[in-house]
Curated annotation (Swiss-Prot):
GO terms for molecular function: rRNA binding; structural constituent of ribosome. It comes from Rickettsia prowazekii (strain Madrid E). Keywords: Ribonucleoprotein, Ribosomal protein, RNA-binding, rRNA-binding. This is Small ribosomal subunit protein uS11. Part of the 30S ribosomal subunit. Interacts with proteins S7 and S18. Binds to IF-3. GO terms for cellular component: ribonucleoprotein complex; ribosome. Belongs to the universal ribosomal protein uS11 family. Pfam families: Ribosomal_S11 (PF00411).
Amino acid sequence: MNQTIKVKKKKKTITLGVVHIRASFNNTIVTFTDIQGNTISSASAGGNGFKGARKATPYAAQVTIDKASEKAKECGLKTISIRIGGPGAQRESAMRALFGQNFVVTSILDVSSIAHNGVRPPKRRRV
C-alpha cells in the first residue's frame, strides 16, 4: 500500500511591507508586497463583487482594502509603507480603511504620474 505523506508548507512571516493602491476612475486595485516587490496579497473592487460604476466608489475601496489586508495579516505583516497613485475619488477612503486595520504606517508616498503635455485628451462630449 502506498502511503502519501502530507507536508505542510511553512508560511513566510513578513513584518515589513509596501501597500500599492491604484485608484483609477473605474476601479481600485490594492497590492501588498514585501520590500523586494514580491506580492503577498492583492484585491480589486471588481474581484470583490462590485460591477460597473460601483467599482469606483469609496465603499468599494474600503471593502477591497479589508480583503487584501486580511490575507496580509495572515502572513504576519505589521509595518507598512503606503504608495498611492491614480486620479480616483476613492484614494482618501482607501487610506482611512488602512489606518483602521491597525498597521504601523511608516510613510505615505503619492506616485501618481503627471503628464507634461502628453497624450491628446478625448473630444468633448455632445449630448
